[in-house]
Amino acid sequence: MVVNVGLIGYGNQAKRLEKFFSRNKTVLKSIYHPKKASKNFTNNLEDLYSNDCIFITSPNHTHFEYLKRLTNDFSGYIFCEKPPIINEDELIFLKNLPDQKKQKIFFD
């Protein structure tokens, strides 16, 4: 089974994941970066929504905003680097998500 993956961000962790994916039955289909748009990158987050899962590897302070947006708009699996949140309000938001959404969110 081939898994289509999208990445948010393209720092060190994303580059490590890219190498890992290339050695497994995973297709890195798209990479989102808010300031880059080219053949390999998109600056439109919705371009990632056709993937089976999305990895959030962006800077720490952006994790929650991406989690919030993806839990509203994306139906696949979400893998988020730590820390996923930076305050209690963000924790409460994640805690109050429906169980169906929580079952598709994973943290590293």
Could you describe each region identified by the protein language model?
Residues 1, 46-50, 71-73:
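Flexible, charged surface loops at secondary-structure boundaries
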Residues 1-39, 49:
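N-terminal Rossmann-like dinucleotide-binding module
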Residues 40-44:
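Short acidic-hydrophobic, aromatic-tinged amphipathic segments that line or gate anion-handling sites
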Residues 53-56, 64-108:
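Beta-strand-loop-alpha-helix segment that lines the small-molecule cofactor/substrate pocket
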Residues 59:
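Aromatic "clamp/platform" in nucleotide-sugar-dependent glycosyltransferases that forms part
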